[in-house]
Design a protein with these regions (language model features):
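C-terminal region of N-terminal signal peptides and the immediate post-cleavage residues
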Residues: 24-50, 54-58
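Secretory targeting and sorting signals
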Residues: 3-31
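Functionally critical loop-and-helix segments that line ligand-binding/catalytic clefts
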Residues: 50-82, 87-88, 242-328
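Glycine-rich, charge-decorated loop segments at or immediately adjacent to ligand/cofactor-binding or catalytic sites
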Residues: 139-146, 234-246
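Aromatic-lined carbohydrate-recognition surfaces of secreted/lumenal glycan-active proteins
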Residues: 219-240
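Substrate-binding cleft of extracellular glycoside hydrolase catalytic domains
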Residues: 57-210, 220
Length: 328
C-alpha cells in the first residue's frame, strides 16, 4: 500500500518521539517501583508531552497525547455558582488544575438557581460541563405510598424533595422536568444529564422504580441521554438497571456513570480506578476546599474520562425540542 506523504518536519517530530520513547524504555525498571509502574507512567507522560509539541510544530493531531490526557480530566462541583469573576480566574490561572465543572439544574432536591443561564458564559471561558439533576432521594427512610392529593401537595410545596415521592410516575415527571431545564439552558441534543442518586445502605424498590422510569423517559424522548451519579456502594446495582434500560430502548451505547468514593483516591488516577470498568467519572474528594488564583471554594473533586462529561460523543443533527413541547 502506498505510504501517505509526510512533511519533513513531521518526520523529524516522529523521529524525536521515537527517540525519546526509546531512551525511556532503555532505562527499563527503576528504583521508583519494583515493577516499573511509576516509570512507565512517567514515560507515557513524557511521550505524550513530546507528541503535543510535535503536533503544535506540524499542525497535525497528536492522538497519543489526547489519549493520555482525556482519561484523567480533573473537574469540580460545588453547590452554588461561584460567580463569573471566580470562574474566569480559576480557568485562567497558571497551572489551573480543573478543566470542567458540575452544572446544577434547578431540581426537586437542589432548588438553588444560581447556575441558571450560565452555560454559555462558562463555555466561552473554556469550561467543560457536567449537567446534574438532583432528583428524589431516600434520605435513609423507607418511602410510603401516598394518596394522589398528598402527592400533589408535596410536589407543589416549597420543598418538593421527599422520599415519599419515589415512584415511577414521579420519575417520569421529573425526567420531563430535567429535559425542559436542560433545553432551556441551551445544551445541545444528546448531551448527557446526570441524575444524582445519593448513597443508600439498602436500596428500596421505590428508588429503582423512580430512576428506572426517569432513565426510560429520557431514552424514549431522545433529545438528551441519561447518565447517573451514584455512590460506589450502590453503583453496580444502578449500572445494571440503567444498562438494561439502554438495551431495552435499543440504544447501543454505554451509559455514563459518575461514581462517588473517597477510598483509594489520588490525583492522577483514572475514573476506572474507583473499582468499576464502567465508571466514566470518579468523585474522590467530597466536602473539601481548594484554592486557585488566591480564591478558595468549597467543592468536591472529580476525574473524568471526558474533558466535558456531558458532551455527546458525536455531534448530532437532532433538532432541539422547544421547552413547551417537551412532553409530546
Amino acid at each position: 500500500m502506498a505510504q501517505p506523504f509526510r512533511h519533513p518536519i513531521a518526520r523529524r517530530a516522529a523521529a524525536l518521539i521515537i527517540g525519546i520513547a526509546g531512551i525511556a524504555m532503555a532505562c527499563g525498571r527503576s528504583s521508583t517501583g519494583p515493577d516499573g509502574d511509576q516509570t512507565n507512567s512517567e514515560i507515557a507522560n513524557v511521550a505524550a508531552n513530546v507528541a503535543q509539541v510535535a503536533a503544535a510544530v506540524t499542525g497535525q493531531k497528536a492522538p497519543m497525547a489526547n489519549a493520555q490526557q482525556q482519561g484523567k480530566n480533573l473537574g469540580f462541583d460545588t453547590h452554588t455558582y461561584p460567580g463569573d469573576k471566580t470562574m474566569a480566574a480559576w480557568k485562567a490561572a497558571p497551572g489551573a488544575p480543573y478543566r470542567w465543572v458540575g452544572y446544577y439544574l434547578p431540581s426537586p432536591c437542589h432548588t438553588d438557581r444560581s447556575w441558571t443561564g450560565k452555560r454559555q458564559t462558562l463555555v466561552d471561558m473554556g469550561w467543560g460541563l457536567a449537567v446534574v439533576y438532583v432528583g428524589q432521594q431516600t434520605w435513609g427512610r423507607t418511602p410510603r405510598k401516598l394518596s394522589p392529593e398528598r402527592t400533589a401537595a408535596l410536589v407543589n410545596s416549597k420543598k418538593p424533595c421527599n422520599a415519599d415521592l419515589l415512584t415511577a410516575e414521579r420519575g417520569r415527571a421529573d425526567a420531563d422536568d430535567a429535559i425542559e431545564a436542560t433545553a432551556r439552558e441551551g445544551f445541545p441534543p444528546r448531551s448527557i444529564v446526570f441524575l444524582d442518586i445519593e448513597r443508600m445502605e439498602k436500596m428500596p424498590q421505590a428508588m429503582r422504580d423512580y430512576y428506572g422510569a426517569w432513565t426510560k423517559r429520557l431514552l424514549e424522548h431522545g433529545q438528551y441521554r441519561p447518565g447517573v451519579y451514584v455512590h460506589k456502594h450502590n453503583a453496580q446495582a444502578v449500572y445494571d438497571d440503567v444498562k438494561a434500560a439502554f438495551f431495552a430502548a435499543g440504544v447501543d451505547e454505554e451509559p455514563r456513570i459518575w461514581v462517588a468514593s473517597g477510598r483509594g483516591w489520588e490525583e492522577g488516577k483514572a475514573p476506572q480506578d474507583v473499582g468499576f470498568a464502567f465508571a466514566g467519572v470518579w468523585q474522590g474528594v467530597i466536602d473539601a476546599a481548594r484554592t486557585v488564583a488566591d480564591i478558595k471554594l468549597p467543592l468536591d473533586v472529580n476525574v473524568s474520562s471526558w474533558i466535558s462529561p456531558s458532551d455527546p460523543e458525536v455531534p448530532s443533527d437532532i433538532p432541539v425540542v422547544p421547552p413547551d413541547r417537551v412532553g409530546e
